[in-house]
From Swiss-Prot:
Signal sequence range: 1-17
Listed SUPFAM superfamilies: Immunoglobulin
Organism: Homo sapiens (Human)
Assembly: Gamma-delta TR is a heterodimer composed of a gamma and delta chain; disulfide-linked. The gamma-delta TR is associated with the transmembrane signaling CD3 coreceptor proteins following the stoichiometry: a single gamma-delta TR heterodimer associates with one CD3D-CD3E heterodimer, one CD3G-CD3E heterodimer and one CD247 homodimer forming a stable octameric structure. Upon activation, gamma-delta TR complex associates with FCER1G to initiate intracellular signaling.
Name of the gene encoding the protein in the UniProt record: TRGV8
GO cellular component: external side of plasma membrane; T cell receptor complex
Name of the protein in question: T cell receptor gamma variable 8
Location(s) in or outside the cell: Cell membrane
Start and end residues of each Ig-like domain: 18-118
PANTHER family noted in UniProt: T CELL RECEPTOR GAMMA VARIABLE 8, T-CELL RECEPTOR GAMMA CHAIN
Amino acid sequence: MLLALALLLAFLPPASQKSSNLEGRTKSVTRPTGSSAVITCDLPVENAVYTHWYLHQEGKAPQRLLYYDSYNSRVVLESGISREKYHTYASTGKSLKFILENLIERDSGVYYCATWDR
C-alpha cells in the first residue's frame, strides 16, 4: 500500500531591499510515496538574482536546501543535499520550478521559496 505524503508549500515572494513587506500564499499538496512533486515559485520581479528553497519541519529550524543563482544560471545545493532528490530551474524570467523526486514520509513539511531582486 502506498502512503500519502502531505506537503504544505509556502511561497514568500521577493522582498525588495527598499521594502520590508512580505506577502505569502500557501498551497497544500498530497502525493503518494515514491512519486514526485513540482512546486512553482512566481517571482514579482524578472530574473531575481538569488532564489532560495527551504524546508521547515515541525519541531525543527527551517533548513535551506538549495538556491538558484540566475546571474550564472546555476544551482547551489547545501552540504548533504542530494542532487538526485531536489532540482530547480527557471521556467520563465518570473517563475522558478522546484522538483522533489522519489518522495518519502521524511519529505513532509512546509517548503518555502524566498528571493530578492538585488
